[in-house]
């Protein structure tokens, strides 16, 4: 794939009244893009909040083709923290693998996702993904991920603080979720199916294993 460069400045805040981040990247455009590019991986993205008044939260990413979920502990629900994870993944996987796995990401209009430029471009100003946004108040448009969050809530019910969570315990929880066998996957787990459908360097880099 040809690497594209573009000069840009990273922002740390975006006005909630400023909807320019959605320009040409709404749900309608998302449907048009995946219809024209049927082989792309589609990833749904969201955050899961802890107890009210606490800062830590989870960033979740869900591969539609195999139901594999990624989950990262954020210190706070901010654009800066989400960008930190994107930059970390880019460095860990390499720009070409990141582009392959995360070509298209669908998310909501949360303030932590509104700096589209910092997510779409790497620190070296290389295009790494395309971010699209659900229509306002239409979380059902990324309903597969919303449904998958129920597995998190089985262990950490709504209102539970994530302040005692660590990267290690987050990964442990995630590995158990991804190893849960699903009727929707013909009795297989997301982990098993993802080993067949996704580049296994993703599993190797992020230490994904199937708990025994």
Model-found features: residue ranges?
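Active-site beta-loop-alpha junctions of metal-dependent nucleic acid enzymes
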Residues: 51, 71-96
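Conserved small/polar residues in nucleotide/adenosyl-binding loops
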Residues: 208-212
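Basic, flexible linker segments flanking DNA-binding modules
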Residues: 1-35
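Acidic/histidine-rich, metal-coordinating catalytic segments
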Residues: 99-115, 136-137
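Charged alpha-helix within mobile-element recombinases
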Residues: 121-122, 128-207
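Short small-residue beta-strand/loop micro-motif enriched in glycine and branched aliphatics
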Residues: 67-72, 158
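An active-site-proximal beta-strand-loop segment
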Residues: 23-66
